[in-house]
Amino acid sequence: MVISVATPRRSIRDAVLGGVLGAGGRQLYQPLRCAFYDGAAGGGLTAALSEDGAEGGVPLPCGRKTAAAKNVLILMSDTGGGHRASAEALRDAFRLEFGDAYQVFVRDLGKEYGGWPLNDMERSYKFMIRHVRLWKVAFHGTSPRWVHGMYLAALAYFYANEVVAGIMRYNPDIIISVHPLMQHIPLWVLKWQSLHPKVPFVTVITDLNTCHPTWFHHGVTRCYCPSAEVAKRALLRGLEPSQIRVYGLPIRPSFCRAVLDKDELRKELDMDPDLPAVLLMGGGEGMGPVEETARALSDELYDRRRRRPVGQIVVICGRNQVLRSTLQSSRWNVPVKIRGFEKQMEKWMGACDCIITKAGPGTIAEALIRGLPIILNDFIPGQEVGNVPYVVDNGAGVFSKDPREAARQVARWFTTHTNELRRYSLNALKLAQPEAVFDIVKDIHKLQQQPATVTRIPYSLTSSFSYSI
């Protein structure tokens, strides 16, 4: 089965130029039409699919449905590990809650269907993160509405046709964005095709506090915020209260519903059963002062007067093989476990008593679920800056960029300040939202069940594209 999509390139370019460079985006445009489908009929995306198709149409092998299954298309990009992790958490929650009622596709439309720079965002992001000043300029420089509006309009001008093909391939009944740049063009495509009344489009924000303004689009059916702070930002950006829900950051079900026993875990992981343990992480890429902090911990967790350790260390090096090799060849004063990229972090977190990590939202949310006091030792400028006060102000941890001071804090918690460690642990558990991913998919299911969900997309390309220059 194929459908034939009328080529939108010229019409889309005309509309983008009209919306951005003239008339302030106030013109009304006729929707593009799929063959065998009248967009004005309001039949939704499913109704746009035909049993037959003209030659040269777009094949739809991925979007075929079982008898009553609904297709969910989750849009993401591998700019950092958090977006994919949230997307896969949502996918797994749909399967657990609704079984075969939904087919879930996790896709990077930019990489699969777009050209530069959409298909190169992962490499570009990693380069800028290694040069944090460059990333800081990029983050704040694109925050003004007119700047990112022009940028997104240019992307729509060149790649909207490809986005149409990508969306149509998966025949979605629901579209979920877990990335700030995976909203504007797809939303406008839905509006252009007259499909927005039947296809709920929701955003799941994956930053705990400070968010780039491109996260907040007026046209979404629902905006799921991980915290009250993010919800306030959404309101300031013009979203309606009816569009906003605060459930927490989606964490994979295998983590948030795992029932773990610390003693059993330490036995399984070959750890000392009697010594308190600190988990040291640098994210998936092993970034930050991991080596310096590990060596400081080795010194501070060794009682030289009694000649015995007062704690043990678990270091997660991620994909950083150089770091892992360096640490494995080192001598230590205390028991140390050196690990690479781990897929079962629930076990290592469950076996430890506190964590030292950079301020990544996913790691913070997981640590809170496990009740681990957090020492934040680094952050990415822009989106991770606000995660520090989120943890510190809620009494779930402390911040220190000095490896030696972080190690001393752990030593105090493990010896003379055990009550403080317990207090931080209780505060972490209070701040945790382990059911967030299930609350989100249940709410999306309710949206899909409604007879006529309307995404509030303006007739201009998007709210970000409408400017007079």
Curated annotation (Swiss-Prot):
Signal peptide range in chain numbering: none
GO cellular component: chloroplast membrane
Transit peptide, residues from-to: 1-42
Gene Ontology MF, one: 1,2-diacylglycerol 3-beta-galactosyltransferase activity
InterPro entries: Diacylglyc_glucosyltr_N (IPR009695), Glyco_trans_28_C (IPR007235), Glycosyltransf_28_UgtP (IPR050519)
Keywords for the protein's UniProt record, in alphabetical order: Chloroplast, Glycosyltransferase, Membrane, Plastid, Transferase, Transit peptide
Keyword ATP-binding: no
Subcellular localization, as worded in the UniProt entry: Plastid, Chloroplast membrane
Tree of life domain: Eukaryota
One matching Pfam family: MGDG_synth
SUPFAM superfamilies named among the record's database cross-references: UDP-Glycosyltransferase/glycogen phosphorylase
Catalytic activity: a 1,2-diacyl-sn-glycerol + UDP-alpha-D-galactose = a 1,2-diacyl-3-O-(beta-D-galactosyl)-sn-glycerol + UDP + H(+)
EC number annotated for this UniProt entry: 2.4.1.46
Single GO BP term: glycolipid biosynthetic process
Main subcellular location: plastid
Transmembrane residue ranges: none
PANTHER family registered for this protein in UniProt: MONOGALACTOSYLDIACYLGLYCEROL SYNTHASE, MONOGALACTOSYLDIACYLGLYCEROL SYNTHASE 2, CHLOROPLASTIC-RELATED
Function recorded in the entry: Involved in the synthesis of the major structural component of photosynthetic membranes.
Family as reported in the entry's similarity comment: Belongs to the glycosyltransferase 28 family.
Full protein name: Probable monogalactosyldiacylglycerol synthase 2, chloroplastic
Organism: Oryza sativa subsp. japonica (Rice)
Lineage summary: Eukaryota, Viridiplantae, Streptophyta, Embryophyta, Tracheophyta
